[in-house]
Regions:
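Functionally critical, mid-to-C-terminal surface segments that flank or help form catalytic/ligand
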Residues: 261-325
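Conserved short histidine dyad/triad with adjacent acidic residue
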Residues: 107, 111-115, 133, 304-323, ...
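His/acidic/aromatic-lined binding-pocket segments of jelly-roll/cupin-type domains
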Residues: 98-100, 107, 120-121, 127-130, ...
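Short acidic-glycine-tyrosine-enriched beta hairpin
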Residues: 195-207, 338-360
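Transition-metal
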Residues: 1-174, 238-239, 246-281, 308, ...
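Ligand-binding loop in jelly-roll beta-barrel domains
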Residues: 102-106, 114-115, 123-124, 133-136, ...
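Loop-centered beta-sheet repeat module
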Residues: 179-242
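Short, basic/aromatic beta-hairpin or loop at an interaction surface
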Residues: 172-189, 323-331
């Protein structure tokens, strides 16, 4: 039976309940500290790699009356009031939007299927990143390098790792020996010579929504001890249905086994044209939309799947917006603000239902807010 909510609740700024993902190996303290949880016993001595700021399974909290509800139940209570009629018409009631705050070291060489293409069970996963601080990543392949040589290098590493994994599990080889042999092979074939290695700048936008583009986060503890600090927006698709790993960087699990790799599918999916691999086509900086009365709005992402703006408000200033055309998701990246009777706290996310209509945010201190919404 659908949840029954009054009009006041449908107009409330609903806070997204924190969902932090512990990652002892590649996470850090950035997300914990940003959310004001640094002194929490629950997170003492722990590292977090991601927080889900919005997902299909999100739970929401109404600060006005302490009520709680799942996102699915809130939408089901009145889809048009929550999402907005234009959003409902174009995207339907199942909002497959995933917003993550990430602190990550290196991950595997990956690719996602482009829209309109089919390959086995794989599905597209349009995504975009906004770098909050300098970092390191790879993006696209080098068009002046042999793709055949790249393919041979990845297959050679993958075949070797599978053989070494079997030997470790069979007791013929120690895990340390297998790791050493793998790193020696990786150094000799050097898969990085075939991809673009990019030093990320703060406020850099990486648009991967086209699909078919090789990408990875990279690790350099001397230059970037915090890893990659990224605000991600993507279509919500489980990794096992969208992320093809071409190279897992020589990583073994403690028992000598391997994470799944999909070298043939990865290579078959990579687009080899300039449109997909020229960095200038996909990497950009914020674009100013408006600036008045102490409030500045910049465009970050403009895609067919989602849009993202950054709103910067000076202390004591106000920002006015209108959600009637479709819901807004707000993440308070810095500072604190006020929306009606609700405090918008740093490190927290809020859902503004379409029924809210026009709303005003007053910055009690200098604030930076990310606003995600759907293009209608």
């Amino acid at each position: 039976m659908p949840l029954s909510l009054d009009q006041r609740s449908l107009q409330a700024p609903w806070r997204i309940v924190d969902e932090l993902i512990e990652q002892p190996s590649w996470g850090g303290r950035y997300i914990i500290d940003l959310k004001g949880l640094g002194s929490s016993e629950q997170w003492s001595g722990k590292k977090v790699g991601q927080s889900y700021e919005l997902s299909r399974k999100a739970k929401l909290f109404n600060p006005a009356d302490d009520s709680k509800v799942t996102l699915a139940d809130l939408i089901a209570s009145d889809p048009a009031a929550v999402l907005g009629a234009p959003v409902l018409t174009k995207f339907g009631a199942d909002i497959s939007l995933l917003i993550k705050l990430t602190q990550a070291k290196g991950n595997s060489f990956q690719v996602h299927l482009p829209e309109g293409k089919t390959l086995g069970h794989w599905e597209p996963k349009p995504e975009a990143w906004f770098y909050l601080a300098p970092g390191l990543f790879t993006f696209g392949i080098k068009l002046d390098k042999s793709f055949t040589d790249f393919s041979n290098a990845l297959h050679k590493i993958d075949d070797c790792m599978r053989r070494l994994s079997d030997e470790v599990k069979g007791g013929q080889l120690s895990l340390d020996e297998a790791k050493q042999k793998t790193q020696e092979l990786i150094a000799s074939v050097d898969p990085y010579q075939y991809v673009n290695v990019v030093v990320a700048e703060a406020d850099q936008i990486i648009d991967l929504t086209a699909g078919g583009i090789h990408h990875s986060w990279e690790e350099d503890n001397e230059r970037f001890p915090d890893g990659n600090l990224v605000y991600e927006v993507q279509v919500d698709v489980p990794d096992e249905r969208c992320s093809m790993r071409g190279f897992d960087k020589g990583k073994f699990l403690p028992d000598g086994s391997l994470r799944p790799t999909h070298v043939a599918d990865y290579l078959a999916t990579i687009e080899q044209d300039a449109e997909h691999n020229e960095l200038s086509r996909h990497i950009s900086k914020p674009q100013l939309l408006s600036e008045q009365n102490g409030a500045k709005v910049e465009s970050l992402f403009r895609t067919p799947y989602f849009n993202l703006d950054r709103i910067s408000i000076e202390a004591g200033a106000e920002y006015r917006d209108d959600a009637s055309g479709g819901f807004h998701h707000l993440f308070i990246h810095a500072g604190n603000a006020q929306l009606g009777d609700t405090k918008l706290a740093q490190g927290q996310s809020y859902l503004i239902p379409a029924a809210t209509g026009i709303y005003n945010i007053a910055a009690t201190e200098k604030a930076a807010i990310f606003k995600t919404y759907l293009p209608v």
